[in-house]
């Protein structure tokens, strides 16, 4: 593992040519102003000073990383990341199940997708803020802040006695959850070379190997039908305990780094906060975080997507002004967001100079489709297995997490293979193709006891495909930019990932709520019975066991709706494969990030892409010359 730190970042600290950032940080050399590039106002000296503070944090991060250049210290770091991943991974594995029981206890099970949409919108808005703040204040402080939000949200959810309060807790919980995952991912990226980056990023996912088998036992013994409140609440102290090792690890890194001469050399450089104080930094952070843009994006997404999940059910309510108003407002906010980002934002959510390159926009497209397709196929898969396949709680929990298990088992072998191949694009394309195969299998096996083996097979294929492209997409785009912009492109990918989950949950929920009740009523013919089956399916199946006419009617209704869900997922696998073809294919090296990028460029465009070259030459092979 010595190759991870074959380059001493401290020796390179005078060579910070971060994607032409010296043109932005130095007003004298910044000839082409933002007015020319974006149609934005000229950046102020104070704002540039805050941007320069980000480079100071990056330099400090590199010195901290060099303090852990021994293999055993790297092993301690990875073990700490594993323990942290175990905490949020196990909680994530079972909390979505408890959410289903919570909504069912409120007789609002169909609002599961509404909560998922709210979660995803909050998550998407949080990603950008976390990434930009981490470059100003450092990774550790943001990580601790995320843990606090996680705990607060967990406590609120555990004490909620209606779906509105549960959703409010979900806002805090998800803001913390995505922050922990993103900052942990950035920390591991800071301390690994591109060649070993995938292995490091896989480490927090490895607990799924254990969690897949114990999650079912936990949920069945916890009796979530009765005790879901305590089952959620106990994570308010379990998860922070799992974060203690990584926090201690980061503190130890800083302690070692502070004793180095390189760190003392940086002491002469004051941060923006040290020079200007709290009030002025708040004013400048308002522009750096693009607070207005983030709020407009979150409000627009929420106003459009949440009504889609609320308008159906026992009674269609599209004629209700309380739904129509927010829905229309969401679309009205889109042009307002565009005008703000183009004319007024100093640091736009989507920085054009980054996003315009295919390395970035194609990876963002894939990130969006990953979660969109996932939620279309799996949003109600657990419920389908319980109600329409007659799985037990333990079995359904294990099967629902099977794709994660397979993906995790394959990940270390694949990551080691990548260190030898040093190319990711062929694997990404093959992984996207496997997802299409998995969606086809889920379409075929969607109800009846005979679907048990088919669903397991589909999720295994899904898991292998997940290994080959979900995390590699992030590493692919990181390998095309400098260290200065690594957190930004990582956050952009994860923001689109969360937006994909929001849209996927909304579309999935819209199909479910608009269709399911009508199908149940059509097959049962009894309004009271159909209403009970729709609103509280877990309670209904305890009364009407497998094989009864009422249960068969409910099973067929679930099969019909799940068919629509998987068709949408299958169709969107086509653009997923198309985006994978558009990726760049940079060679993975022993450096933390791309070190030299031409002035004025934000992405390394001098990569060799054999796959795209082959496709470009393909038409010439079928041309015929006239004799």
Curated annotation (Swiss-Prot):
GO terms, biological process: intracellular iron ion homeostasis; siderophore transport; transmembrane transport
Keywords of the record: Cell membrane, Endosome, Ion transport, Iron, Iron transport, Membrane, Transmembrane, Transmembrane helix, Transport
GO cellular component terms listed in the entry, alphabetical order: cell periphery; cytoplasm; cytoplasmic vesicle; endosome; endosome membrane; fungal-type vacuole; nucleus; plasma membrane
TM helices/strands, residue ranges: 71-91, 111-131, 136-156, 168-188, 198-218, 232-252, 291-311, 324-344, 368-388, 399-419, 425-445, 455-475, 564-584
Extracellular membrane side: 1-70, 132-135, 189-197, 253-290, 345-367, 420-424, 476-563
Chief place where the protein resides: membrane
Disulfide pairings: none
GO molecular function: siderophore-iron transmembrane transporter activity
Entry membrane topology: Multi-pass membrane protein
Gene3D superfamilies in the cross-refs: MFS general substrate transporter like domains
Membership in a protein family: Belongs to the major facilitator superfamily.
PANTHER family in UniProt: GLUTATHIONE EXCHANGER 1-RELATED (PTHR23501:SF92), MAJOR FACILITATOR SUPERFAMILY (PTHR23501)
Protein name: Siderophore iron transporter ARN1
Source organism of this protein record: Saccharomyces cerevisiae (strain ATCC 204508 / S288c)
